[in-house]
């Protein structure tokens, strides 16, 4: 029985896409493996958001191909955003590569791999030097309806959480971001199809779903409003009605299109988790304008305030870029000030990384790496201090925790998350995995909480 190995880089959307690909192969008789040296097909799902992610994927794929020269039958494929961006160029960088598949062609991966294998068998390519030739496939063309092809799941009955892709594409075109060029225009799935997928997951035992989109709150912009509610809130309400689903999350929204109906949803949809990941990117209006993010920081801060009024226990996490071209010390200090004002529960802080083909890559006044690093470390210290204090304040409280499964670092413990997306390690029996239980928080080690189940009553 042939074996498939998939390595995924980047965001939750990539993880979901990889799962769809894996499901297709398993349906055709493949088994999954976590060992590259026993795989017959090796696929990487790549990320282009930063250069480091691209270099990791390129380096790893090149190393694997060299290490396995004695296994000429293995098919090597690159999928995802880097595949979409670099296209045939990847065959020059990775001579052993067989397949390049773009972001709208995940549903074609199996047929391409199968075609490559059949071609090799027909030609009886037994010699190492000829086994690599004539099998290159590059499929990066746009395909209508591709957003509706990411709908199948791999073994949904063995876990309590799942990602659900509700749309693809992005049309905001921030100056630093390659995603609009790799993911295409915005395309939304019908509400009915999303709800059917969520029902299937609930029937399999899933209790928490995370709705995915490049800018998730722009879902269904072409839909008619109903009672003053846009398409995304209509979808949230429909998913909320699915029996068996206990928690709903969504990532990632954008201040543009973040309507009051979405703020209000936090007041009447109890399954909506008390957490939002809400990218700020900069606290400077001047830098936001240069980034082509068409809002003022005041708008962002006001949205944070209104969301916390709607859901007082809401935790807010964010993304921030430091060292964007032209960022002055004053601009950076405005970002630092905004972080202190919002009191984020956590933040991903990135040093600006030029991406080929984006407007920011050719802007003047590129910031020296040592300045980027200094600002990164300074802001990280501010964020960490806030996050550690907030977690410490939870010691002694009782939190509802979804126990997701064994801890990766200690199999004797279960790991889970609160509604606020705080990771919790729990001393609990393995058969409690998948349950949502009240957990007394006994310790905080900074970013991780530790607790025990509360005694059952009666």
From Swiss-Prot:
Listed PANTHER family: CDK5 REGULATORY SUBUNIT-ASSOCIATED PROTEIN 1, MITOCHONDRIAL TRNA METHYLTHIOTRANSFERASE CDK5RAP1
Presence of keyword 4Fe-4S: yes
UniProt-listed SUPFAM superfamilies: Radical SAM enzymes
Limits of the Radical SAM core domain: 156-389
Protein name: tRNA-2-methylthio-N(6)-dimethylallyladenosine synthase
Reactions listed under catalytic activity: N(6)-dimethylallyladenosine(37) in tRNA + (sulfur carrier)-SH + AH2 + 2 S-adenosyl-L-methionine = 2-methylsulfanyl-N(6)-dimethylallyladenosine(37) in tRNA + (sulfur carrier)-H + 5'-deoxyadenosine + L-methionine + A + S-adenosyl-L-homocysteine + 2 H(+)
Protein task: Catalyzes the methylthiolation of N6-(dimethylallyl)adenosine (i(6)A), leading to the formation of 2-methylthio-N6-(dimethylallyl)adenosine (ms(2)i(6)A) at position 37 in tRNAs that read codons beginning with uridine.
Positions with a binding annotation for [4Fe-4S] cluster 1: 11, 47, 81
An MF annotation (GO) of this entry: 4 iron, 4 sulfur cluster binding
Cofactor binding note of this UniProt entry: Binds 2 [4Fe-4S] clusters. One cluster is coordinated with 3 cysteines and an exchangeable S-adenosyl-L-methionine.
Location of the MTTase N-terminal domain: 2-118
Entry keyword Iron-sulfur: yes
Amino acids binding [4Fe-4S] cluster 2: 170, 174, 177
GO cellular component, one term: cytosol
Gene: miaB
Subunit text: Monomer.
The enzyme's E.C. designation: 2.8.4.3
InterPro entries for this protein: Elp3/MiaA/NifB-like_rSAM, Methylthiotransferase, Methylthiotransferase_CS, Methylthiotransferase_N, Methylthiotransferase_N_sf, MiaB_methiolase, rSAM, rSAM_horseshoe
UniProt record similarity statement: Belongs to the methylthiotransferase family. MiaB subfamily.
Pfam families given in the database record: Radical_SAM, TRAM, UPF0004
Domain (TRAM) ranges: 392-455
Record keywords: 4Fe-4S, Cytoplasm, Iron, Iron-sulfur, Metal-binding, S-adenosyl-L-methionine, Transferase, tRNA processing
Listed cofactors: [4Fe-4S] cluster
Localization in the cell: Cytoplasm
């Amino acid at each position: 029985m042939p074996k498939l190995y998939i390595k995924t880089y980047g965001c939750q959307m990539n993880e979901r896409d990889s799962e769809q690909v894996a499901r297709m192969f398993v349906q055709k008789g493949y088994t999954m493996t976590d060992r590259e040296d026993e795989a017959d097909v090796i696929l990487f799902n790549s990320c282009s958001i930063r250069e480091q992610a691209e270099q990791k994927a390129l380096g790893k794929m090149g190393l694997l191909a060299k290490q396995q020269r004695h296994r000429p039958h293995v098919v090597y494929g690159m999928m995802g955003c880097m595949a979409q961006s670099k296209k045939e160029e990847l065959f020059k960088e990775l001579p052993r590569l067989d397949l390049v598949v773009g972001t709208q062609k995940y549903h074609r991966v199996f047929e391409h791999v199968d075609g490559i294998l059949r071609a090799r068998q027909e030609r009886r390519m037994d010699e190492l030097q000829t086994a690599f030739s004539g099998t290159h496939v590059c499929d990066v063309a746009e395909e209508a309806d591709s957003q509706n092809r990411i709908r199948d799941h791999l073994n949904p009955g063995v876990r309590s959480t799942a990602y659900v892709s509700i749309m693809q594409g992005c049309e905001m075109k921030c100056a630093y971001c390659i995603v609009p060029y790799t993911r295409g225009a915005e395309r939304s799935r019908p509400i009915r199809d999303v709800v059917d997928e969520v029902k299937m997951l609930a029937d399999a035992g899933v209790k928490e779903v995370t709705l995915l989109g490049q800018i998730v709150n722009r879902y269904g912009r072409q839909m008619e409003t109903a009672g003053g509610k846009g398409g995304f809130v209509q979808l949230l309400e429909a998913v909320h009605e699915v029996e068996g689903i206990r928690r709903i999350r969504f990532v990632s929204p954008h201040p543009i299109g973040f309507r009051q109906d979405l703020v209000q949803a936090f007041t009447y949809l109890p399954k909506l988790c008390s957490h939002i990941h809400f990218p700020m990117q900069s606290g400077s209006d001047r830098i936001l304008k240069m980034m082509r993010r068409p809002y003022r920081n005041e708008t962002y801060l006001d949205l944070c305030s209104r969301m916390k009024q709607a859901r007082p226990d809401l935790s807010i996490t964010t993304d921030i870029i430091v060292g964007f071209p032209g960022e002055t010390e004053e601009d950076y200090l405005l970002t630092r000030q905004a972080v202190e004002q919002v009191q984020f529960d956590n933040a991903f802080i990135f040093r600006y990384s030029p991406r080929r083909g984006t407007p920011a890559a050719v802007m003047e006044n590129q910031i020296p790496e040592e300045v980027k690093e200094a600002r990164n470390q300074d802001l990280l210290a501010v964020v960490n201090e806030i996050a550690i204090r907030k977690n410490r304040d939870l010691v002694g409280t009782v939190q509802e925790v979804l126990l997701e499964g064994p801890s990766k670092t200690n199999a004797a413990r279960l790991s889970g998350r609160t509604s606020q997306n705080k990771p919790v390690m729990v001393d609990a029996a393995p058969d409690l995995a998948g349950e949502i239980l009240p957990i007394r928080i006994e310790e905080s080690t900074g970013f991780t909480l530790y607790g025990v189940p509360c005694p059952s009553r009666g």
